[in-house]
């Protein structure tokens, strides 16, 4: 009992430390960013204690002691669920946020509103903690909307840029589509079960849950950038690099997958929803991997790799391995945040240059960043004994031994091999070869605020997967036996991707530039999806509206139906009842002929 009580108190302390940091320290002081970063680091260190206690004892805790309100028969209370998912994800999110905040002090040092930027990052962290620990749908929805509005503010941080404003609006609008599904699910649970508490929902175990789970899947599709609602994720790269690292590594984008993992007691008995998740995740992971192959913006390549990994997590939930998907969330956070920070280091060093075609040869001038970027890329591809290997290898093994849907699983394996291709492309273009940037650029990475956060994430990218997978037992039963060739598939697929990428890069190095093929255009223009959705569809609807307004209303009704029809009717009526036909030329001609004949006759007489 004492162990559980101390664990609970420490967990609550973690949640309150960032809030105390934002409230008790003067917001206008120059030292505010340092204070916030220090508080988050303390919160991370404190969070390790209850996590270790939980690992040793395995006791879940639920705190529900503050009553909010009672609406007819529904009682709403503030309740926290400190279980496997929240206790493991909290230290991961706090450690990544700590590193990103320290990196932001270097990256955003010249920004006049850096204090406000840190305030936004802190609020984002608080809402994410609320989402992770929520025990009822209403509280979870508050955290869900909180991360949504904070992402809007952070993506549109450089509000003087049109692209940043458009990207922020795009993010909020696509997420609103997903929120409709969340609200439908909340309404269904309230109407049918009269509760929003997760334990009660899982205990009641309703039978026909297709509608609420489809709503939750739509919500996850919007938040986790699955196919159809994915364009906001690459567009969100218009925000500062620390924002990209925080939102698109460990926190906001995985919230949708986390929601589905939370509801796994309902999804594991619903084969329809599992198949939908599997197919949606497979399409997402392949499509975004293809899009990443031909991008030239270094941040967009990393963003598409995030979307591809989210598709892989969705596939994992779809084959009924939610705890494996959660493990991939935790491992993915470290190396993906590090990849973004390395990209930020390169971009900042090259005077805001993001095009990989204008980089090259950086392994000499940025040796530490090069080491971290290569390690992160190898971890992303699932290189053995790096962090990504411990989750990705298990996922591919589970896919190979699953009999759910061979088509979806096959294209997921293709997407996994493409991961190695675009990772090799970043290394090849940005770090190796000859420098392709101006010689006057001053590069200096010997700055503690830059080195230390990447160093911590580098350690996490190497060892975190080992520690997490060794200390946590899988609660979803894994495949116990499999043939040797299936066991080695994950490594073989990755190696195949590396070999293909290196061969293609070497073979095409000295080729003449040819007009791009349709396949390259399809990949480079993101499958024409933004063009169709953001340009063609609005243009078609606007042109249709214009035609209806001008042709149907103005021309047909206001012009043809009334004034012109009246004038035509009057003309026809007057022509019909009048003896004069209005042929004035004929009248003049007959008059002239008559006059001429009369004159001739007078002359002869």
Curated annotation (Swiss-Prot):
Top-level EC class as recorded in UniProt: translocase
One example of a Gene Ontology biological process annotation: mitochondrial electron transport, NADH to ubiquinone
EC number(s) per entry: 7.1.1.2
Keywords: Electron transport, Membrane, Mitochondrion, Mitochondrion inner membrane, NAD, Respiratory chain, Translocase, Transmembrane, Transmembrane helix, Transport, Ubiquinone
Disulfide bonds: none
Subcellular location field: Mitochondrion inner membrane
Record family assignment: Belongs to the complex I subunit 5 family.
Protein name, entry field: NADH-ubiquinone oxidoreductase chain 5
Organism name: Rousettus amplexicaudatus (Common rousette)
